[in-house]
Amino acid sequence: PRKTTAPKPTAPAGPATATVTLPTANEQFDYQIGSAYTLPKNVRVVSRDRTAKPAAGLYNICYVNAFQTQPDALDWWEKNQPDLLLRDGSGAPVQDEDWGEVLLDTSTAGKRERLAQIVGGWIDGCAKSGFQAVEPDNLDSYERSDGLLTKQHNAAFARLLAQRSHAAGLAIGQKNTTALLPERKTIGFDFAVAEECGQYEECEEYAAAYENRVYVIEYTDTGYGRACAGWGGKLSVVQRDLDVSAPGGSYRYRAC
């Protein structure tokens, strides 16, 4: 990526009380959701956790785990909102075992409204901290729900988050989940954050849907090579280590 034109304000989809600024396509990107650190040279767009500070002078995307619990937050949910955790027939929380996270229950309108109050508070916090956009993670949690959640449950919740984001003056990114690309406008998504679209040959779908406003993270050499060869001139493509760690140890970052 070499473009340096400033992001242009655009009218958001759905209700809004503030101007939303979209990220510029094909600017150099870094994915710092594991730990914030000094930015590599030429980076203009960065994604950081909602608890981190945004980078001065850059376009900052705020990472929010909106559809699952953070591993260290499960006790809070169990104590304060136990019925918002998705549970199986025996009453046990349904887990994303790869990451040690419990799925949030988006299956009813009432629960979605309550979840939107909680996650919406985080989104408002992103705006107050100075971020320009939000990426709600685990939009695809329904795929790990053993049939207890559907694509439409999560789309309906994402719509509430898009409305809250736009009202706070934040753009909102679709995180993965090509199955929901046809509903992107109904939901209100503005751009995409796509993990491993090179690895799984999905970059073209995101690029077409979002006019190249796609921020690609690859974790393998193969995926990075494919994404760069096919899309490095149009999309923002980086390779990170799976733990998205700070420099040192397993840290890896490169961009094309």
Where are these regions (language model features)?
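Secretory targeting and sorting signals
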Residues: 1-4, 10
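Glycan-processing catalytic domains of CAZymes
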Residues: 9-256
